[in-house]
Amino acid sequence: MATTTTEATKTSSTNGEDQKQSQNLRHQEVGHKSLLQSDDLYQYILETSVYPREPESMKELREVTAKHPWNIMTTSADEGQFLNMLIKLVNAKNTMEIGVYTGYSLLATALALPEDGKILAMDVNRENYELGLPIIEKAGVAHKIDFREGPALPVLDEIVADEKNHGTYDFIFVDADKDNYINYHKRLIDLVKIGGVIGYDNTLWNGSVVAPPDAPMRKYVRYYRDFVLELNKALAADPRIEICMLPVGDGITICRRIS
């Protein structure tokens, strides 16, 4: 049956409203910890495979961290589980973590390491680390951690300066100041062994990497967005590594050094 002018106008108007609504949805403030579009699906993942297997110490630290005003900085529970398994899969023993916060990912790493495993952990804020330290100590893994308070770059420069340290790290996790990720990578690529892994957190950065330029964002999200985009391009073009970007937590890029 032929469509009348009025019906066509209504259809056009409806389509226009649908497009506007879709555009408005895309312009909502970005800031969800999980990048899954379905909260129910994410909750299903947590309740089915994450929380039932989460060590009691990690659960306790997660709950303590949830009360902290900057709790959004913590590693998500599903990402903690992923890191724990990844470290076991690569048989990591000598590791490094840049950016600790209260230590959730640090604890996930320490629990996965063998008894003589080591973590060089760096963060500018010892107070946050000490919030989780009693739980880490109770879990019996504090002896694996060498915590250094202060900016990571000077420490890395000192380590890189000694060629004996080159290629000695099995696994490195970075969840720190995004504006220095490129600077970290330039140093870490020499420190991780061939076949070793570097994990960069927040590489999808609240989904902002695909947000329109005029999308409402929190100031810190907008500020660091370009640095994350720069890192992602650099990693994709780096012939010394194989990469895999995963939508776990806020996005994590796994880099395996091949040369």
From Swiss-Prot:
Where are the membrane-spanning stretches? Answer: none
Q: Where does S-adenosyl-L-methionine bind?
A: T75, E97, G99, V100, S105, D123, A152, D177
Q: State which pathway it belongs to.
A: Aromatic compound metabolism; phenylpropanoid biosynthesis
**GO cellular component term, pick one:** plasma membrane
Q: Please share the entry's free-text remark on the cofactor.
A: Binds 1 divalent metal cation per subunit.
Q: What domain of life does the native source organism fall in?
A: Eukaryota
Q: Which reaction does it catalyse?
A: (E)-caffeoyl-CoA + S-adenosyl-L-methionine = (E)-feruloyl-CoA + S-adenosyl-L-homocysteine + H(+)
Against InterPro entries, the record matches this protein to: Cation-dep_OMT, SAM-dependent_MTases_sf, SAM_O-MeTrfase
Q: Where is this region: Disordered?
A: 1-29
Which Gene Ontology terms cover its molecular function? caffeoyl-CoA O-methyltransferase activity; metal ion binding
Tissue specificity is: Expressed in stems and roots. Detected in leaves, siliques, flower buds, flowers. Expressed in the tapetum, but not in the endothecium. Detected in the vascular system of leaves and all flower organs, including stigma, stamens, petals and sepals.
Family indicated by similarity = Belongs to the class I-like SAM-binding methyltransferase superfamily. Cation-dependent O-methyltransferase family. CCoAMT subfamily.
- What task does this protein carry out? Methylates caffeoyl-CoA to feruloyl-CoA. Has a very low activity with caffeic acid and esculetin. Involved in scopoletin biosynthesis in roots.
Tell me the protein's name. Answer: Caffeoyl-CoA O-methyltransferase 1
Source species of the chain: Arabidopsis thaliana (Mouse-ear cress)
